[in-house]
């Protein structure tokens, strides 16, 4: 019988060795799905430029930059040719088309959620809504606006790359639907990714 003992314990040792070689399973119930070739990760552009050109026979023009920042996109720059000391509405519009003389080709405000028009940061509003610009005595306004919940160049539904920025003749009243009673479109520029 001493010869049978190693034969009886050999299968038991193999079973124990196989169990020990199995890696422990991690709990993945709350983890996000792994990125595969079928679902690539979306990355944002690092910068876009907006060259605002006159519309509706105005003399308004300017240059803005857009960069991803926090949970949104930050717009900065300068707009000139505005009525001195006046407020002017500025919005991101749904189409990157400034070909119409009155910039109507840019469509409505960028509004992927179907929200009512309002004031950014104060309740429901379009994703493209921003606070009014304030022109100085020379008719120049500095833009320093943050659009929360939008992206830049990732191709998603909330991406503002390829859309247009519009400056209006009047201030936005933040109440009137669908566009804040902001008057004529006096400048238009497409948000173009540069890197």
Please name every model-derived segment.
Residues 16-18:
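C-terminal motif of bacterial Sec signal peptides marking the signal peptidase cleavage site
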Residues 2-6, 20-195:
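N-terminal leader/targeting pre-sequences
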Residues 7-14:
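Sec-dependent signal peptide hydrophobic core
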């Amino acid at each position: 019988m001493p010869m049978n003992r190693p034969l009886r314990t050999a299968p038991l040792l193999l079973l124990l060795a196989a169990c020990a070689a199995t890696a422990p399973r991690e709990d993945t119930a709350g983890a996000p799905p792994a990125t595969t070739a079928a679902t690539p990760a979306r990355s944002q552009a690092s910068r876009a430029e907006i060259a605002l050109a006159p519309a509706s026979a105005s003399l308004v023009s300017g240059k803005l930059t857009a960069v991803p920042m926090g949970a949104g996109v930050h717009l900065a720059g300068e707009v000139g040719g505005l009525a001195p000391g006046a407020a002017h509405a500025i919005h991101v519009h749904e189409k990157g088309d400034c070909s119409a003389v009155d910039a109507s080709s840019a469509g409505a405000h960028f509004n992927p959620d179907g929200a009512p028009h309002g004031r950014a940061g104060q309740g429901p509003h379009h994703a493209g809504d921003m606070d009014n610009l304030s022109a100085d005595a020379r008719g120049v306004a500095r833009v320093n606006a943050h659009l929360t919940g939008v992206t830049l160049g990732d191709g998603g539904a909330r991406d503002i790359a390829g859309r247009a920025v519009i400056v209006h003749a009047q201030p936005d009243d933040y109440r009137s639907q669908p566009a804040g009673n902001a008057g004529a479109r006096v400048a238009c520029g497409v948000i173009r990714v540069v890197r």
